[in-house]
Swiss-Prot record:
Composition bias type Gly residues, residue spans: 27-45
One family name in Pfam for this protein: Homeodomain
Function summary: Transcription factor which plays a role in hair follicle differentiation. Regulates FOXQ1 expression and that of other hair-specific genes.
Family that this chain belongs to: Belongs to the Abd-B homeobox family.
Protein name: Homeobox protein Hox-C13
GO BP: anatomical structure morphogenesis; anterior/posterior pattern specification; hair follicle development; nail development; positive regulation of transcription by RNA polymerase II; tongue morphogenesis
Subcellular location: Nucleus
Length: 328
């Protein structure tokens, strides 16, 4: 069936939408005169093409699945003025019953038409919308297709489930210890989205830090620094103030506390120290520097060795004198 809709050129710009509804609500409308229709009524694809292009009596006899309601703009609801010669027409082709659920955009009218109409087809989750204006020398604009997922129906339910799932993604806060497990060598950063931020979550909750080290001693605890006696001492606590003096082993870190393990001197070092002690029991500053350079020991080590050597000799002398005093 081909229906002709005629609009007066003095009417303002209007929009008309097509909504799918039951047959009982599609009977409103007014009949047109000999030249066209002044209102909008129900249309059905089962009507015979031999009827006159009038819109009277088209509602009520059509099934609910094939009927469409033409809801006019509020401007169109006022009584129309008498129409003169038709200024233009828009032809809407209604397809066969098997294709009633899918409507193609209407064909473009002749170039001589000056009165056009705006309408839309919400079929199958999609929306065909046309906005046409009533100008004398303006042709009809092509219809634009809007997918249903981009322009959802306003009657649909709000995406509450989607919002709740998004809220679960931002549940990583420092106070929630059960959300994740802390890893050594990483800092925990909360992922709280801002008001104007991107809605997608950022997966950067763990940021590596180069200078951070997690000290885990094999013979102690993480909360305490413990140094057992079985550990081998790998460095000395004394360092030579001269750049040319190289210590035997690298200096130990200051975080290890406790008594260091005794490191015996080598035979070459002991021989050099005994020779200098035989020459003089007390050393000067120049002599201490020279012994430190030759024995590869620090000046503090040389000084302490001479002190210990004098105490040892004093003990030996005192022990040797003790039996002699008791005998007398």
């Amino acid at each position: 069936m081909t229906t002709s809709l005629l609009l007066h050129p003095r009417w303002p710009e209007s929009l008309m939408y097509v909504y799918e509804d039951s047959a009982a609500e599609s009977g409103s409308g007014g009949g047109g005169g000999g030249g066209g229709a002044g209102g909008a009524g129900g249309g059905c694809s089962g009507a015979s093409p031999g009827k006159a292009p009038s819109m009277d009596g088209l509602g009520g006899s059509c099934p609910a699945s094939h009927c469409r309601d033409l809801l006019p703009h509020p401007v169109l609801a006022r009584p129309p003025a008498p129409l003169g010669a038709p200024q233009g027409a828009v032809y809407t082709d209604i397809p066969a019953p098997e294709a009633a659920r899918q409507c193609a955009p209407p064909p473009a009218p002749p170039t001589s038409s000056s009165a056009t109409l705006g309408y839309g087809y919400p079929f199958g989750g999609s929306y065909y919308g046309c906005r046409l204006s009533h100008n004398v020398n303006l042709q009809q604009k092509p219809c634009a297709y809007h997918p249903g997922d981009k322009y959802p129906e306003p009657s649909g339910a709000l995406p509450g489930d989607d919002l709740s799932s998004r809220a679960k993604e931002f549940a990583f806060y420092p106070s929630f210890a059960s959300s994740y497990q802390a890893m050594p060598g990483y800092l925990d950063v909360s992922v709280v989205p801002g008001i104007s931020g991107h809605p997608e979550p950022r997966h950067d909750a763990l940021i590596p830090v180069e200078g951070y080290q997690h000290w885990a001693l094999s013979n102690g605890w993480d909360s305490q620094v413990y140094c057992s006696k079985e550990q081998s001492q790998s460095a000395h606590l004394w360092k030579s103030p001269f750049p040319d003096v190289v210590p035997l082993q690298p200096e130990v870190s200051s975080y290890r506390r406790g008594r260091k393990k005794r490191v015996p001197y080598t035979k070459v070092q002991l021989k050099e120290l005994e020779k200098e002690y035989a020459a003089s029991k007390f050393i000067t500053k120049e002599k201490r520097r020279r012994i430190s350079a030759t024995t590869n020991l620090s000046e503090r080590q040389v000084t302490i060795w001479f002190q210990n050597r004098r105490v040892k000799e004093k003990k030996v002398v005192s022990k040797s004198k003790a039996p002699h005093l008791h005998s007398t």
